[in-house]
Amino acid sequence: MYSMMMETDLHSPGGAPAPGGGLSGQSGAGGGGGGGGGGGGKAGQDRVKRPMNAFMVWSRGQRRKMAQENPKMHNSEISKRLGAEWKVMSEAEKRPFIDEAKRLRALHMKEHPDYKYRPRRKTKTLLKKDKYSLAGGLLGAGPAAGGPPAVGVGMGVGVIPGGVGQRLESPGGAAGGGYAHMNGWANGAYPGSVAAAAAAAAMMQEAQLAYGQHPGGGGHPHHPHPHHPHHPHNPQPMHRYDMGALQYSPISNSQGYVSASPSGYGALPYGSQPHQNSAAAAAAAAAAAAASSGALGALGSLVKSEPSVSPPVTSHSRAPCPGDLREMISMYLPGGEGGDPAAAAAQSRLHSLPQHYQSASTGVNGTVPLTHI
């Protein structure tokens, strides 16, 4: 109880000693005079308390007296009243307590000549720092920002549920080496702006999803509105194209259907030859480098460059027919049951792509206005 009263006196408003006492910068605590010992325990013996100043010497008796008179009064309210009362006291009334404080300080210096006051850290500030570091650790489990940039920006669109989050780049221009980033932030990067990080990552994820609704490589921008008559909205074939292209590799038979990644939008026309795969890889690497310096800027440049792509083809999917439904069902069957039929279906589907795109290009040209974006 006494130690709690001492701590409250330390933080009370009137805790500053009298000007004549010279005790404002004094160190230390407890062992001698009226200061009392450390409680006899090992922790109490290790930590030496500071000597009392004049206000503490006076308020020790006054606090006990006021607590007896007002047993329901809170300790903080008692401290406020004691501080206000100490301020209005005259110098003559304070003199005996100032002298007692000087004696206690001299005794403390004699008993602890090498004592140096070390203030204890406040737990509130530590909790705030731990909260920010914990939030940074939850956002990312990869290496810190400044590591090697992520090369795999062009992973298959929609192949796995976490694909979009894994492809996002760090705003600082250098994502971590692994694909363990959630929302594109590295571990411990920008710990003080967690809300801004979440907002930026959500914007980038929406942009990636908007471009991922249809298979990549087209010269026609994406229409988010389902009421356009020339392309019914059907995002399901995106999974079928990507799964077939990654699992069964029909790239060489599809007349240049080589781009299934968001970094390859507008990079190559559908009429290119299979030997241009290296050019596609170079274009994807260049787009990845551009995305690392600013993912949103790269998306904006791609939107601007899409209408001028030649030949004017569209990348929109057709309405599903019963055959497509069977293909979609067979795509998600285990490898032992539907592996070969799915491979054959994917091959035939990709063989028919050039004719479909050429027929669709007669109705829709590549210069559609971008007012819908």
Swiss-Prot record:
Compartmental location: Nucleus
Biological processes, Gene Ontology terms: brain development; negative regulation of transcription by RNA polymerase II; neuron differentiation; positive regulation of transcription by RNA polymerase II
Disordered as annotated region, ranges: 1-48, 211-241
Annotated DNA-binding residue span(s): 48-116
Keywords: Activator, DNA-binding, Nucleus, Transcription, Transcription regulation
InterPro entries found in the cross-reference section: HMG_box_dom (IPR009071), HMG_box_dom_sf (IPR036910), SOX_fam (IPR022097), SRY-related_HMG-box_TF-like (IPR050140)
Any one GO cellular component localisation term in the record: nucleus
Compositionally skewed regions (Gly residues) per UniProt: 17-43
Gene3D superfamilies: High mobility group box domain (1.10.30.10)
Motif (9aaTAD): 327-335
Basic residues composition bias: residue spans: 220-233
A single GO molecular function term of this UniProt record: RNA polymerase II cis-regulatory region sequence-specific DNA binding
Broad class of where this protein is predominantly found: nucleus
Pfam entry (one): SOXp
Superkingdom field: Eukaryota
Record remark on domains: The 9aaTAD motif is a transactivation domain present in a large number of yeast and animal transcription factors.
Its job: Transcriptional activator. May function as a switch in neuronal development. Keeps neural cells undifferentiated by counteracting the activity of proneural protein and suppresses neuronal differentiation.
Identification of the protein by name: Transcription factor SOX-1
Organism: Gallus gallus (Chicken)
Lineage of producing organism: Eukaryota, Metazoa, Chordata, Craniata, Vertebrata
